Amino acid sequence: MSSLREIILDTETTGLDPRQGHRIVEIGAIEMVNKVLTGRNFHFYINPERDMPFDAYRIHGISGEFLKDKPLFHTIADDFLEFISDSKLIIHNAPFDIKFLNHELSLLKRAEIKLLELSNAIDTLVMARSMFPGSKYNLDALCKRFKVDNSGRQLHGALKDAALLAEVYVELTGGRQSAFKMVDKSVETNNLATNQVNNKTEQATIVIKPTKEELQKHKEFLSSILKTA
């Protein structure tokens, strides 16, 4: 059986529109194979080379001072593109993240880099609107609907929000009964994660009915991200 690799992705930014000079300050992406989290992820804070507006700071709590010594986007771009490769992207409100990522990629002025296609993204916001018309569709509301524990989400954060979205996405596409066998390895959330984790996707297999131990491993995976991201 061929493997289905999907990347659950989120970003944090300095504002709402890259055309007004706003930039990405955090990228969080989590690998899922056959609807199973592998424990492999990509996470960076990024120096936006500009100030942090207070309105944005109130949302994610990332200060300009904190970002001063963080890498510039161009230094992590190749690793990011390698991590997502040709996989389907799972994003909540995909047009927002795609436009910011493409803006950052366009600033590199490298002819060999192709911009991301919105058609290659699955938008969980669109899915939720279709499935639950008239309801609230933000991540907190969906976590509440599906009883996903988001108690550690006082502020937005790209990696922790991607972890929550992974749970929501599985619920939107069939529920926990069809997924979430966790790979038995520690979660790597540092900047070397893409090189340190074994990428043998055959380790991930679909589980029709997860055991208590498997569900506990998933909870521990999510908790570790909420505590450290």
From Swiss-Prot:
* Co-factor binding details: Binds 2 divalent metal cations. Magnesium or manganese.
Write down the EC number: 2.7.7.7
Q: Where does a divalent metal cation 1 bind?
A: 10, 12, 161
**Kind of enzyme, top EC level?**
transferase
Organism listed in the record: Rickettsia felis (strain ATCC VR-1525 / URRWXCal2) (Rickettsia azadi)
| UniProt-recorded name of the protein | DNA polymerase III subunit epsilon
Q: Name one GO biological process term.
A: DNA replication proofreading
* Any one Gene Ontology molecular-function term assigned to this protein's record: metal ion binding
Necessary cofactors = Mg(2+); Mn(2+)
State which gene encodes it.
Answer: dnaQ
**Which residues hold substrate?**
10, 12, 55, 60, 161
Active site: which residues? 156
The source's domain of life comes to Bacteria
Residue sites binding a divalent metal cation 2 per the record: 10
**What reaction gets catalysed by this protein?**
DNA(n) + a 2'-deoxyribonucleoside 5'-triphosphate = DNA(n+1) + diphosphate
| Protein keywords | DNA replication, DNA-directed DNA polymerase, Exonuclease, Hydrolase, Magnesium, Manganese, Metal-binding, Nuclease, Nucleotidyltransferase, Transferase
| Function statement | DNA polymerase III is a complex, multichain enzyme responsible for most of the replicative synthesis in bacteria. The epsilon subunit contain the editing function and is a proofreading 3'-5' exonuclease.
Note whether 4Fe-4S occurs among the keywords.
no
Q: Which GO terms describe its cellular component?
A: cytosol
> Mind telling me which PANTHER family this protein's record contains?
DNA POLYMERASE III SUBUNIT EPSILON
